[in-house]
UniProtKB/Swiss-Prot annotation:
Residues 25-34 have a biased composition (Polar residues). One of its GO terms (biological process) is translation. Residues 1-20 have a biased composition (Basic residues). Pfam families: Ribosomal_S20p. Belongs to the bacterial ribosomal protein bS20 family. The gene is rpsT. GO terms for cellular component: cytosol; small ribosomal subunit. This is Small ribosomal subunit protein bS20. GO terms for molecular function: small ribosomal subunit rRNA binding; structural constituent of ribosome. It comes from Variovorax paradoxus (strain S110). NCBIfam families: S20 (TIGR00029).
Amino acid sequence: MASAKPKKKNPRLASGRKRVRQDTKLNAANTSLRSKYRTAVKNVEKAVLAGDKTKASELFAKAQSIVDTVADKGIFHKNKAARDKSRLSAKVKALALAPEKAAA
């Protein structure tokens, strides 16, 4: 696990103190969203590995929304979000087409 950062000195100016409060809240929000993003992607990949088509497509739809939200808020770059969505989509699509190719 990551070790705790050393405590910084408290700012003297009121604007500095306010900035510290804001940064703490934003850091918590960004950490939470980043965690949701990673969890959503992992859940889709698990469903694909398990071979569950319906669950994978449902989870992919939810993951798309989360990925877009994270990109809009600037937590991850929009190109990274697009790349991850594209890769997940390809995995879900390959899962959906797999039995048809095996039967043909």
